[in-house]
């Protein structure tokens, strides 16, 4: 597959009886959730799919796929990652970045420049952005990605400066 695919969400659970499924989205824009997309189970290859409708209901994104017309049919999609071609992503400002572009960046403490590790993964449990940072020793450090803790992202240097809450890093030693 030559085009670059970007994860934009994870399918959660069916909604109603007409084939809609909840989507935990990684993007604010709902526009990317129409037309040709790709679905991926765990570590398998992505498969093409088509979203025929998308909407926001009580703050939750709901999508409906072609060929999935009822609740039991869409149940098989639960837990799959929704991917789109990078070319479908909306333009962003020069001072913004897509999360997928930050993966692999070095994460350092703001006050000492000590390297904590590399940004490995981003998840959204309970709607809160949570960064998984892998230390040089191979340990995982989880950091809530809020402005108080993430001070600077330098895309040119591929560097993220953080000021974690007191005691957080000690939990992982």
UniProtKB/Swiss-Prot annotation:
InterPro entries: PRC_barrel-like_sf (IPR011033), PRC_RimM (IPR056792), RimM (IPR011961), RimM_N (IPR002676), RimM_N_sf (IPR036976), Transl_B-barrel_sf (IPR009000). One of its GO terms (molecular function) is ribosome binding. It comes from the Bacteria. The keyword Chaperone applies. Its main location: cytoplasm. Coiled coil: none annotated. It is found in: Cytoplasm. Residues 94-168 form the PRC barrel domain. GO terms for cellular component: cytoplasm; ribosome. GO terms for biological process: ribosomal small subunit biogenesis; rRNA processing. SUPFAM superfamilies: PRC-barrel domain (SSF50346), Translation proteins (SSF50447). Belongs to the RimM family. HAMAP family: Ribosome_mat_RimM. The PRC barrel domain binds ribosomal protein uS19. An accessory protein needed during the final step in the assembly of 30S ribosomal subunit, possibly for assembly of the head region. Essential for efficient processing of 16S rRNA. May be needed both before and after RbfA during the maturation of 16S rRNA. It has affinity for free ribosomal 30S subunits but not for 70S ribosomes. This is Ribosome maturation factor RimM. It comes from Lawsonia intracellularis (strain PHE/MN1-00).
